[in-house]
Amino acid sequence: AMAKQLYDYWFVQFDFPNEDGKPYKSSGSAMVWNEELKREIPQGWSNMSIGDYAPCKSGYAFKSKDFGGKGLPVIKIGNIQENYTLDMTDSQCIDLFNKTLFLAKRYDLVIAMTGATIGKFAISQSNYWVNQRVGRFDLGDRPLSRLGFLFNSLKQEYFREQVFQIACGCAQPNISAEQIDSISILKPNDVILNQFNKLCEPLLELQSENYLQIEELTKQRDELLPLLMNGQVSVNSDLSHG
């Protein structure tokens, strides 16, 4: 929530600190009209396509015979949740697959490219393979250092509208990696962009740690519940030995 507030303040209201440390737009600094984004933006800023910042790569068409219980879990469109997380509870795994182009690392961003979930995206909290109809944004070797700006840019209503506009021409809503790449987003100057990404890093890290902790506790609960219900363990004895 803090990162979103900061994004709105800097990149929607344009009140990032200017050279004198004052809020840019509120203190009367120059704004210019940007035709592509259909709004006024700070002088010296521009627009860029998503592909310029982090190209989207399509997932791999795994065959059902390849799925098993071992290896890395595979992200399918159904795993992408409304709250920007992945629910990998019932995921299937792929073993002995070496195509790193289709690997989502921790802090990578993945997006649903078809069906009712189109345009939904999530932060990957571990290493996963990416299935077809899921896209992965290539944020480079240290995704966390560039994640903040892209993650919050995609949260803007404008991005979802663009996705629907492109996708709704088909019977089955569908968007390609190239079409996602072509969507325009704001291009701040490098100083402000890097500053924002740096401020987001600890917030996203904390969010990730909390997510992994909840996932671990949920797993423990699901393992313990059946044992408690059929009397194989009792709460008191197990807690006193903890």
Each language-model region and where it sits:
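Alpha-helical scaffold segments that mediate packing/assembly in large oligomeric complexes
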Residues: 5-25
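Extreme N-terminal leader/activation tails
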Residues: 1, 149, 171, 234-241
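A short beta-sheet element
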Residues: 76-77, 93-159, 164-171, 175-178
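Flexible, active-site-proximal loop/turn residues at the rims of small-molecule/cofactor binding pockets
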Residues: 81, 116, 189
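Non-catalytic DNA-recognition/assembly elements of restriction-modification systems
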Residues: 1-6, 24-60, 182, 186, ...
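Sequence-specific dsDNA recognition surfaces
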Residues: 31-37, 48-64, 73, 78-106, ...
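Extended non-membrane alpha-helical scaffolds
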Residues: 72, 121, 140-142, 148-155, ...
